[in-house]
Amino acid sequence: MGETKHILKRSEQKKENMWSTEDIFASDEAWKAEFAAIKGEEQALAAYAGRLSESPEVLLEYLRKSEELGLRIEDLYNYTFLKNDEDTKNTVYQGLKGQMTGYLVQFQQATAFETPEIIAIPEETLQKFYEECPELRLYERYMYRVRRRKEHILSQAEESILAARSEERRVGKECRSRWS
């Protein structure tokens, strides 16, 4: 008969074999401080609704703010999901993951206008924007990728409804995976 292998607990692992979540946030308190700092930032982006085609400067300003917030959200998300995956029975990280997921729904609802508005900008107008504001070209690839999905994009209202329902879908999936 074969030898039974002992599966190491996280506390028994060598540090070099573990994720270095402290490279993202030094502590849970640092994560909580950053999470508190971004709460409401999605509303600053929502203020651009109906304005993205106003001028190249407005579009560039929105894209920069969205990118900056997106990177901050990505760090928050990665930290909570990695910490949760370290020990899926740890209720502290289940809670942080739940908070983060809830915030993502709010963010998606607040920015549901982005894709439909970018798609609605006529190609000639967009080319004119690039000429008037060369810095906007930094986002040219992004704009192309958004616009090529035109046939598959819903209206702002429909995108917002889908964003709102994503929390319900996530909870169902999480329950299934936890009990599997």
Model-derived regions: residue spans:
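A well-structured
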Residues: M1-R176, S180
